[in-house]
């Protein structure tokens, strides 16, 4: 069993605080045309005394040059999470499967398309009413 299969199949209740070096994660962004694979090469937990030990900040330093800081990570890693990357301000989607990441990106794209389509319709309606 490879590491990817092990991570997906055996960690149903794992949180980001449980991620270890060598784990495979997937990530993507709205402005990317693919979902990237990354292997965690370093993790750093910042446990906050005000929270339970399972709520923490995690920094992932990956082999492809990215560093992710995720705060308050009490989350099932099968639910793709969204956070803003501090360097470029883009929303980054990260999860344990390509499918989870892709679905969340598509969901956001669809909601944005719907938002702008609705706004366009309202604008056209108001514009026509003014005539």
Specify the residue positions occupied by each region the protein language model found.
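Short beta-strand-centered aromatic/proline hotspots
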Residues: 31-49
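Eukaryotic intrinsically disordered, low-complexity tracts enriched in Ser/Pro/Thr/Gly and charged residues
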Residues: 14-17, 31, 80-87
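Short, solvent-exposed secondary-structure boundary/capping segments
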Residues: 45-59
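Intrinsically disordered, low-complexity, charged/polar segments
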Residues: 57-130
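Mixed-charge, Lys/Arg-rich low-complexity intrinsically disordered regions
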Residues: 2-20
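Solvent-exposed strand-loop boundary residues in beta-sheet-rich modules
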Residues: 30-31, 64
């Amino acid at each position: 069993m490879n590491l990817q299969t092990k991570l997906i199949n055996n960690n149903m209740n794992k949180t980001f605080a449980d991620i270890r070096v060598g784990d495979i994660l997937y990530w993507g962004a709205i402005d990317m045309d693919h979902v990237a694979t990354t292997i965690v090469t370093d993790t750093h937990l910042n446990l906050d005394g005000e929270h339970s030990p399972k709520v923490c900040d995690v920094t992932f330093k990956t082999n492809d040059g990215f560093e992710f800081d995720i705060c308050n990570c009490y989350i099932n890693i099968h639910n793709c999470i969204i956070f803003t990357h501090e360097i470029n301000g883009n929303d980054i989607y990260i999860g344990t499967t390509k499918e989870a990441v892709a679905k969340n990106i598509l969901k956001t794209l669809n909601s944005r398309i719907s938002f702008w389509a609705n706004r366009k319709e309202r604008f056209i309606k108001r514009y026509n009413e003014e005539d």
